[in-house]
Amino acid sequence: MITSRTVSSLEKIFHDSEPTCASLSEMSMLGNERASFQLAYFSDEDTQCGISVSGWKPENIKIYKVVEINSDLPAFEDSDFYFLRKTPGLYPDMLEPVEDNSFFAESGHHGSLWIELDASGESAGRHDIFITVSKGKETVTNVITVDVINAKLPEQELMCTMWFHCDCLATYYKVDVFSEEHWNIIENYVRNAANHGVNFILTPLFTPPLDTEVGGERPTVQLVDVKKTKDGYEFGFDKLDRWIDMCRRCGIKYFEMSHLFTQWGAEHAPKIVAEVDGEKKRIFGWETDADSEEYRDFLHRFAAALTACLLYTSDAADE
């Protein structure tokens, strides 16, 4: 047997606890908005289930399974009381795309599907959305009414950024950094971020020195090419230009340049790789004091070159 009901996207469905939240029967959205809700389900046996959504244009529907991930430290000892749980365990977090309208329901587990609707191209008015879960000959259908308001959400005025770590994408998908495959993956993620309200992107001039163990390194993701010469440094901005063009194409308007000093005190330089005598070498990093004469000289030269690049890029975009 399988049971299901629609609930708010703000709810958290834990596998070991029956949800006590209210069901969601109605919601509204503007004519160019995206909105989401969840289908909470429970199965008394391991089974492959079918899922179908009707009453909305298929191309404007995305369905994900909410996957729990392990958290060893959900909260610090001195945290406040505004937590659903504080114990180590599994927490609903990752959205895994449902393929072939099918998902696996674990025996005795509560779970949820995340359903995203895009109102683009939908007519104004009330729409009854039918969500059907099938298990063999057994089917369960839930209905939620979506009111599409005859107005459009104005362009976002807030500057919204989320730290975007493209080294993680290279690691997860096992591709070379800034290979064509990596660029394609980055663009897909940037476009998805822009579609969900992000208009400000972390831009890795050099490998961002963020969330990195002291003395450790993240995989190198450096958009600026650096060459050390007898007279100082030469800088290449081809990858940065490509990054900016790609982000603008995806809907990004603002660029947050990666930090020029390490996190938690700004005591050191970030990892910077340069061509030295024909070889790629790390020339700055944890061993470099932030206020060292050599790094200050580098920043002085780099700032001038970067400013000229960005001014040119801005003028070209205006034309």
Located regions from the model:
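Long, low-complexity ectodomains and other extracytoplasmic segments of secretory-pathway proteins
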Residues: 1-25, 29, 44-45, 138-177
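Surface-exposed binding patches on compact interaction domains or structured appendages
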Residues: 2-21, 45-115
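Short, solvent-exposed loop/turn segments enriched in Ser/Thr/Gly
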Residues: 21, 32-38, 122-130
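Solvent-exposed, conformationally flexible loop/turn segments
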Residues: 27-34, 44, 106-110, 124-125
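Aromatic- and acidic-residue-enriched carbohydrate-binding clefts of CAZyme catalytic domains
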Residues: 78-94, 164-168, 209-250, 266-301
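Extended acidic/polar, glycine-enriched regions
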Residues: 102-156
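An acidic-aromatic substrate-binding cleft motif
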Residues: 142-215, 248, 253
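Conserved small/polar residues in nucleotide/adenosyl-binding loops
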Residues: 312-319
